[in-house]
């Protein structure tokens, strides 16, 4: 275990609540807590068993004044999250009391933790690897049950296990090559022929490709689908956002141009997180404020993963409608024909022609009809209706995906070398490169600056 000083931070969100927790970790965690904790029975925390909780008060050692009534948990190394001694002081929720306790802890020998430092220590002390540490962030930020399940799988080490198995295969192959090169006279060691080397490399490439095949779905679950709602003014875009969000998030009126800016909302559609973006109606306008909103809408359109194009069932198609179809050509689009509670004036055959095989859903948002069909269309478009079975390991982190792509390229370079008859000692350079890249995923071959950058994304106290 690495030697560190003792750190402390508030581990619960600030604000009013039932409890707030000050967490300490390090060799002096119990000693510092003992300076402040007073039990009604007079017992000291250094004498209590590990993984126990105790009632008492936090007392200012200088004045002897009671600061807070608390429950204190004592957990001794190595069976803790950081593999260090950990103390958690459970205070009443609120701003004042928990900050008073934290200030006393800091005044008595602890240092204020940096963002993510508790998890960083868990990594540096070998409690978790880097991919598991990153999964902690994903778990905190998960917007749906399925996104949370993917994060939990990664925290449990499912991805780590696969990566380590691939690294071990490469390492054994490299060792075999080295033995053949250094000790060619050993007849009892199987020769690493180009055919055998190719089999090993192709196996590793196949496993990497299998992981990468989950990347699109994994990133959607982790980051959400950037879903932009577009359409002429007053076709029901804001009503659609409200319907999917199941609340009145956007203003709905009969006045065209009510939405003058971009409104964002996270919604859960059948386990798929959507970052739903309601845009200002795209049209030519003299209103300066609305014009700015329209320009922002155009910019959001370029970054969208999914576009919900809303039309008015009660009105004929216009040049603006047709222009929107042209703007979204080649993109993932679901066409929504809204206001079907009113008489039909739209040319549905022309809509089908413009949609060019893309899904069309009829809705009456006013009457709450068609929402289920729309949600199914979204799930069908990206996940074939349902996510894969729970035993599939998803790759959802952009850093992991990039490293897997690079490792695959290194393996392919090795295979190309084998095909052209390159000596095996040169082929192993590419194999070693793949081994190192895979090691960066779990943190075995990662630079310290990257570690600092990754853990800086965490909140204080985690």
Curated annotation (Swiss-Prot):
Regions annotated as coiled coil: none
InterPro entries: G_TrmE, GTP-bd, GTP-bd_TrmE_N, GTPase_MnmE, MnmE_dom2, MnmE_helical, P-loop_NTPase, Small_GTP-bd
List of residues binding (6S)-5-formyl-5,6,7,8-tetrahydrofolate: 23, 88, 127, 462
GO MF: GTP binding; GTPase activity; metal ion binding
Cofactor note: Binds 1 potassium ion per subunit.
Domain TrmE-type G: 224-383
Entry binding sites for GTP: 234-239, 253-259, 278-281
Signal sequence interval, chain numbering: none
Enzyme class, first EC level, given as a word: hydrolase
Chief location of this protein within or outside the cell: cytoplasm
Protein keywords: Cytoplasm, GTP-binding, Hydrolase, Magnesium, Metal-binding, Nucleotide-binding, Potassium, tRNA processing
Cofactor or coenzyme needed: K(+)
Gene Ontology CC terms: cytosol
Residues the record lists as binding K(+): 234, 253, 255, 258
Binding positions (Mg(2+)): 238, 259
Similarity remark: Belongs to the TRAFAC class TrmE-Era-EngA-EngB-Septin-like GTPase superfamily. TrmE GTPase family.
Assembly and binders: Homodimer. Heterotetramer of two MnmE and two MnmG subunits.
Entry protein name: tRNA modification GTPase MnmE
